[in-house]
Amino acid sequence: MRIAAGVGQNKDVIEAIEKVDFEVFKVESEEELVEYLFNGFADAAIRGSLSASKIMAKLREKYSDKMSRASFIELDGQKFLLAPVGIDEGDDVDQKLLIAEAGSRFLLSLGIKPKIGVLSGGRPQDKGRSKKIDKSIDEGNLLTSILIDRFIDAKHYFILIEDAITDGANFIIAPDGISGNLIFRSIVLLGGGKGHGAVTLGMDEIYIDTSRSNDVEGYKRALEFAHYLVKSSER
């Protein structure tokens, strides 16, 4: 098994590589990282501290716009996926539906039954306060209804993310990618949660996105997540 790790400005990636007990090789350009992933030289890759936008652009040359990222987060012993987290992802119901279905398939592939918590921009009684709030709540209701019709366990928690986590949701769908990115940063970079990287959905290869703000332990967890996914795919 070979895992590629991107090394950019944040050199904590190198220290993380030295802390794991499996083979990881360093890559210093986005083009090389994607090439090694696509030609099979690497069984998985993590972004490390390379450019996310450049890597995603290269990946989309093969996979079009059907890809999205879901962060794997651990908070107070509970583990869950959070998506969308790319600021240009999840802008409408169709995109969020693709993300929800792809993430559900990913969880099922690991033997985990998806339990989706859909979020929106207000409580039910907040409808009428603004067109933006109304649109967000309506989209949350519609997305939840479609998922239930497709036999996926889903509940609309509106703006109450804390209730979704308390209820044991293992896949949180944010109102859009900007909101999801802010939730990720609040939980992982400020709130003491642990980030394990973001799995890229909608592609055959295993690619884990990571934040350039990660520390050594954050990159180490992402490497271990990639290693776990490769081992799981071999079963």
Give short role names for the model-derived ranges:
Residues 1-165, 170, 179-235:
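Anion-binding alpha/beta catalytic cores of soluble intermediary-metabolism enzymes, centered on
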